[in-house]
Amino acid sequence: MKVEAFIPAVLLLCFGVMLCLKSSCALQIGNNNELKNYISWEDLRVVEDGRIERSFSIKENSNWVTTNANANANATNVRRVIVVDKNGGGDSVTVQGAVDMVPDSNSQRVKIFILPGIYREKVIVPKSKPYISFIGNESYAGDTVISWSDKASDLGCDGKELGTYRTASVSIESDFFCATAITFENTVVAEAGEQGRQAVALRIIGDKAVFYRVRVLGSQDTLFDDNGSHYFYQCYIQGNVDFIFGNAKSLYQDCDIHSTAKRYGAIAAHHRDSETEDTGFSFVNCDISGTGQIYLGRAWGNYSRTVYSNCFIADIITPVGWSDWKHPERQRKVMFGEYNCRGRGAERGGRVPWSKTLTRDEVKPFLGREFIYGDQWLRL
C-alpha cells in the first residue's frame, strides 16, 4: 500500500472515532437531561455496597463548590448526598439546614439522608429547589421523625392565626420530590367538632412526587394533598377527621389508612370544585382500619372525586359511607365510588344512593399509575 493512500485512511478512521465519541457523549447528556424529569428507585437509595455515597454540591459566593468522595468522578454527573445528623456527625444538624444547602434552580437529584432521630422542626422545601429526596433508615420509617405541633388557632409571627395550611410540619412546594423511610408528624391531638385544632403533618403542593414507605401521623387534617400528581406506595397514614384532604390527583396504592377517631370522622375530603379539573383521590389495595364510625369521604368541593378499589375496609365505616358536607346540591356532582372492596365496612347496603358501585370498565382509569400519568414521570 502506498503511504499517500494510508494517511487519508487513518485520518478518516480517527474522524469516525471522534464522531462516535461525540455522539455517545451527546446521548449521555441527553439521557441525563431526560432522567431528571423522572423519579426512579435510584432516587430513593443512598447506600450501595455498604457505604454512603458522599457527594454533593453547595453554592458559595455564587460559585459551585463540589465535595466528592471519588476524586475522579465528574461533579456534573454524580448523584449528590447531604447527610443530616442531629448529633453533629453529618453535613447539617437539621433537615431545613440540609434543604438550604441545595442551590436555587437546582437541576440535579440531591439526596438528603436523614440519620435516625426525632427532628423537632418545621421544614419547607421551596418551589425553587426541585429534584430533592428525603431518605431515612430503610428498615423502619419510625426511626427518623420530623415533628412539629402547630395548630390552626396558633398565632404566627404576623400576629394572625396560622390557619390550616401554615400548620404543616413539612411543606413540599417543589416538583419531583420523593421520600422514603421517614415519619412526618404533627403531635396536636384533636377530636371531631373541636375548633382551631386542624394540624397538618405533611403538605404537598409541588407536582410529581413519590412517597414510599413513609408514615404520616396526625389527627385532624393530617395530610394536605394540596395540588399536583402524587404517588403514595406502601405508606401508613393516620388521623381522624378529613385526614387526607386537598385537590391533588393522587394514587394511594397498598397503603395502611388508620383511623384514630373516638366517635366520628372522615378519611378523605377532596376539593375538586369544577368538572373540568383533572383531580381526585384513588385508593387501591389499601387496608383501612382503626376506630370510630367514619366516612370514606366528604364532599369538600362541588365536584369532589374519591374512589376505593380492591380495599379491605374494617367495621369502622358509617353505613351511609359518604357525606355531602351539608350541601345537598353536591350530591349530583360528586364522584364517590367503590369497587370490589371487602370487609364489614365495605358492605354497601346502607350507602347513600348518590354514591356508586363501579363496574370494571368504570373503575379501570383509577386502578393504576396511568391515573396520575405515571408513564410520563415514574420509572419504578
From Swiss-Prot:
Disruption phenotype: The mature pollen grains are arranged in a tetrad. The active site is at D221 (proton donor), D242 (nucleophile). One of its GO terms (molecular function) is pectinesterase activity. Disulfide bonds join C235-C255. The keyword Hydrolase applies. GO terms for cellular component: extracellular region. Pfam families: Pectinesterase (PF01095). Belongs to the pectinesterase family. This is Pectinesterase QRT1. The lineage of its organism: Eukaryota, Viridiplantae, Streptophyta, Embryophyta, Tracheophyta.
